Amino acid sequence: MQKLYNKLIKYNIKDAINFEEIDRQFLALKDLYLNKKMNNKNYLFLIITNSLICYQLSGKGEDYWEEFSEILENKEFNNFPEIYNFFEKFIPESRNNRRFIETKLKRVSKLENFYLEFLWKTEFYYKNMDKLILDLSKVMNQKADAKTIVFAVKIFSYWSRNIYDFQYFPENIMIPIDSRLENLYKKYENPLTPLPGGIKEFYINLSKKLNIPLLHLDAIVWVNYDELIK
């Protein structure tokens, strides 16, 4: 881990936030917010929902969020059935998310009982994103560190920054483990002193050493991955 730490020590949390805010997914949501010029909490719920079906895409994630944001510019939502009906029509017609349609619609359905609670607690959830992680994991019957659950909270934060005062990601939210992180772990782990907690412990230790919360660290790794993997 020390070699990876040495390459990342030049970055701090401000750098991470700057990287996040040039992310095409962040920019797509910011453009949507500016175009709509509204704080409708249904949009926050819609974005959480979309995050939870943002996997096994038929295109790039950045392209999908731009497509999603563009199609929302002329739409309004006032209740859960309207949100479900939107996804029921949108997913099969999407250029970038046409795979596993039935499975994804079932995931949307799971959120119905969470809808009203979420609308009441949006600001609370933004200030307590670790609580949102736990509640989403219960609703979706997934682990709190599951990639889609963590990603949903990340995207929720992206939109919420337009509405509320900026909040850092809590330190106890896990970084979403994907192929990039697995490749870096294989490259930089010390096989002579394996960690009991494996890849998760590796990144937790790196986060603490850099003093950058795990989910903010994700942005630094994303932007610098090609250099780090050399």
Which residue stretches match the model-derived regions?
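HhH-family (HhH-GPD) DNA N-glycosylase catalytic core used in base-excision repair
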Residues: 1-230
